[in-house]
């Protein structure tokens, strides 16, 4: 069995069906003896260019180990499913189980956002104390 990285884009009007689609595709791979090494739902994102006048899509990425037969069946499912607007299959030398760069960047962005929001509350509390101490220093003079 070979390793593949599969990314498919789902029409934004069909975003609520992504869970069922992923379940169907993973079942197809596992029934043929394959393994899902990584599954990431990147959510709805802006496309770099419009595809059939659609500017956003729901992205899903899978790293799988499967047979050529299962992969061909999966590609047929993509081809005949109108909700899948694009797909990409890349052959890999080995299984990739770590987080993708896309997911890491998203987590870093959310962590920075949390850190940015947190100090505002902490600074205002600390700032009040320092202002009071400065005022008391000035009162002594």
Curated annotation (Swiss-Prot):
InterPro entries: Ribosomal_bS6, Ribosomal_bS6_CS, Ribosomal_bS6_sf, Ribosomal_S6_plastid/chlpt, Transl_elong_EF1B/ribsomal_bS6
CDD domains named among the record's database cross-references: bS6 (cd00473)
Skewed-composition ranges (Basic and acidic residues): 103-124
Annotated region (Disordered), positions in chain: 97-141
Transmembrane segments: none
Keywords: Ribonucleoprotein, Ribosomal protein, RNA-binding, rRNA-binding
Acidic residues: bias regions: 125-141
Pfam families: Ribosomal_S6 (PF01250)
Gene Ontology molecular-function annotations: small ribosomal subunit rRNA binding; structural constituent of ribosome
GO cellular component terms, semicolon-separated: cytosolic small ribosomal subunit
Lineage top rank: taxon: Bacteria
GO biological process: translation
Family membership noted in the UniProt record: Belongs to the bacterial ribosomal protein bS6 family.
Protein function: Binds together with bS18 to 16S ribosomal RNA.
The protein, known as: Small ribosomal subunit protein bS6
Source organism of this protein record: Pseudomonas fluorescens (strain ATCC BAA-477 / NRRL B-23932 / Pf-5)
Phylogenetic lineage: Bacteria, Pseudomonadati, Pseudomonadota, Gammaproteobacteria, Pseudomonadales
Gene expressing this chain: rpsF
């Amino acid at each position: 069995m070979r390793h593949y990285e599969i990314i498919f884009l789902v029409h934004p009007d069909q975003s609520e069906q992504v869970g069922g689609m992923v379940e169907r595709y993973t079942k197809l791979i596992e029934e043929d003896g394959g393994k899902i090494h990584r599954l990431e739902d990147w959510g709805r994102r802006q496309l770099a260019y419009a595809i059939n006048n659609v500017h956003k899509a729901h992205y899903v990425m899978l790293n799988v180990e499967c047979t050529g037969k299962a992969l061909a069946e999966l590609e047929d499912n993509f081809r005949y499913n109108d909700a899948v607007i694009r797909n990409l299959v890349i052959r890999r030398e080995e299984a990739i189980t770590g987080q993708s760069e896309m997911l890491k960047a998203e987590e870093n962005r959310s962590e920075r956002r949390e850190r940015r929001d947190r100090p505002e509350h902490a600074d205002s509390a600390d700032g009040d104390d320092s202002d009071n101490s400065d005022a008391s220093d000035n009162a002594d003079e």
